Each structure stands twice: as C-alpha cells, then as structure tokens.
C-alpha cells in the first residue's frame, strides 16, 4: 500500500501547538486521498493519525510491541493510538523504519528527539544511496526546517560531504502543493 510517512515526537499532547500542527498535516494528507503511516503511538504520531483518519484514509501504525510495553518506565502509554486502523507489528526498530519507508511516496519529518533523528538519517541515507546507484527514484523528504535546520545544514560540513547532499529536502511550507500533485 502506498502511503506518506510521517516521523515525529511521541511526547507532545493535544492542545499544544506541535500537536495541532501535526493534526493539520494529517488532514492535508488525507484531504488529497493519501494513506498515512506513522510509528503508531502518541504525540505527533497520534495527531497525524487523527487528522488523516478524519479524512477517511487508511492510517497505518507500525508498532514494536517487543520494545514498547503497554506502559513504559515513565508511565507513558505505549499502545497504538486510537486513530490507527491498520496496525503493523514490527520485530525491531530497524524493521519499523524499513516498513515505514517501504512504498512511501513522501516522508515528512516533524520535530522530535533521538528516534525521529534516527528515522531522518535513515531516510536521508536511503536517498543518498538511491542517488548514487541511480536505481530508484528519490523519496521526497519534507522537514519543518526551522526545527531541523542546524543539523541539516551543518551535518554535510562536519562529514565532508558534497553540498548536493542538502538537495534531498523540501520545506514543509511547500507540502500542500506537492501532496496535491502526488498520484
């Protein structure tokens, strides 16, 4: 199933601006009839799922039950959010990221922590390898650039990479124009 993948924090709550923005992203994706895939838990994953489900599309949540029990040590709920209508259980974080990237038409990276950073880097590296091997179309990656700018801008300098490495990203401000044209 083709979908648009959204990565983001599990920590924001309903009523916070980050949550509301993520819900709007989900609504926008669903408005144009695209299915959505997230990590399936709370925070921005829940907000995106809620917005997309309200538009009647399939909302896949790729969970990792072996790592995330019903409650974590800190008391955060770790069940799929109630807006997921297609749970995919992955065996590991690596498998989870693989499922989320597989068949993805586009990737949206919202603010997050180390898990979101890992997902961003795997998606970024996948596009880099696709570009080198010229055997697959690049997956458009949309960032909330005001949040990710420092990492994205400095990383190629620190790793002595070609500045072309930065061309893999689009600003989330261009999202509606892009999503409206996807098949």
Where is each model-derived feature located?
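Glycine-rich beta-alpha loop segments
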Residues: 1-61
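Short glycine-rich, flexible loops that bind phosphorylated cofactors or substrates
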Residues: 13, 115-117, 132
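Acidic/glycine-enriched connector segments
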Residues: 43-110
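Short Gly/Thr/Asp-enriched flexible loops that form oxyanion-binding sites at enzyme active sites
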Residues: 47-52, 118-131
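Short, acidic/small-residue loops that bind anionic groups at enzyme active sites
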Residues: 61-65, 110, 124-151, 161-166
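A charged, well-structured terminal subsegment
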Residues: 99, 161-183
